[in-house]
Amino acid sequence: MRFYRTYLLVAGAFCSLCTLAVIFNCGWDDSPPATPSAINGGGSNAPLISSPTNLPETFLYISILTSPNETERRQNVRDTWFRLSTKGPSVFIAKFAVGTMGLAAEDRRLLAEENEKFGDLALLDRHEESYERLAKKTLACFVHAFANFKFKFFLKTDIDSFVRITPLIINLKQIQDPMLYWGFLDGRAKPFRKGKWKEPEWNLCDRYLPYQLGGGYVLSYELIRFLAINAQLFRHYRNEDVSVGAWIGGLDVKYVHDPRFDTEWRSRGCNNEYLITHKHTEQEMQEMFENLKKTGKLCAKEFQKHPSYVYDFSKAPSECCTRVNGSNIP
């Protein structure tokens, strides 16, 4: 019995010493904190993601994808739909996203001068512009926004899209969801195997996963956070909108299909209910702006070039989207 008691005392003392050693080594770690590049896998190509604290705050961050040489198109946007709202940066902040990697010194100088004058460029110094890298650029926009701004929602749109910013924000406040993915949803598209939009890397299934068309779509902050933090893990498909749909396809996403997003590869026409309308010339953008200022309506006359649809969530994605000629669907 005496031996047993001695054994227990020795074993207890040994365990106590081990516990103290573990607490000392783990609880008072004086090593430096992990850097953003370490968090994201390290390496010179790792996107730097800072902790989103003490950042400028806004309700809606807008990223407009544009090329370095599209100076006139950027000015066209400033002169048209940027002027539709007098709300300050607490409501929305809009930035033109431009890749600067590989640019000539003169091009960089011109962009720097433009940004000094207007303060509305997001210069992506780790991105080299090309159509083949559009998905990568979109992801870089997510990373840049997450690292530099605090927002509730993110709108990705194109330089040839016209945005009715006030009704867009009003509607967004009505439907806001922490996992929102809002736009014109497609679930039955088959991958292109040749041509400009071919997808040689797509092998998940014989159709694309449901995705919002690329002329303009809204993502919640939580989805942007997920995309930014995991940016290095994603495969980049040729089409940026297809890529986004695939990247978040396994999450508990709140999909909202809205025919008021005229955001397909070609415009469906003109409808006064449109919140965003895509594929327009500078002249068309100016005309829509003048119409809104004079009459409060987007269109001088409504018309439909191509039929729209309402997404049927009760059916399989491949059967989701039946276009109806002559309907009142925007």
Swiss-Prot record:
Cytoplasmic domain ranges by topology: 1-5
Gene3D superfamilies for this protein: 3.90.550.50
First-tier enzyme category under EC: transferase
InterPro entries in alphabetical order: Glyco_trans_31
Residue spans, topological domain Lumenal: 25-330
Pathway stated in the Swiss-Prot or TrEMBL entry: Glycan metabolism; chondroitin sulfate biosynthesis; Glycan metabolism; heparan sulfate biosynthesis
Gene Ontology annotations for the cellular component aspect, listed alphabetically: Golgi apparatus; Golgi membrane
Knockout or disruption consequences: Worms are infertile because of the failure of the progeny of homozygous mutants to initiate cytokinesis and because of the failure to form an extracellular space between the egg and the eggshell.
GO molecular function: galactosylxylosylprotein 3-beta-galactosyltransferase activity
Reaction equations catalysed: 3-O-(beta-D-galactosyl-(1->4)-beta-D-xylosyl)-L-seryl-[protein] + UDP-alpha-D-galactose = 3-O-(beta-D-galactosyl-(1->3)-beta-D-galactosyl-(1->4)-beta-D-xylosyl)-L-seryl-[protein] + UDP + H(+)
Function: Beta-1,3-galactosyltransferase that transfers galactose from UDP-galactose to substrates with a terminal beta-linked galactose residue. Required for vulval morphogenesis and zygotic cytokinesis, suggesting that glycosaminoglycans play a central role in vulval morphogenesis.
Name recorded for this polypeptide: Beta-1,3-galactosyltransferase sqv-2
Organism annotation: Caenorhabditis elegans
Gene this chain is encoded by: sqv-2
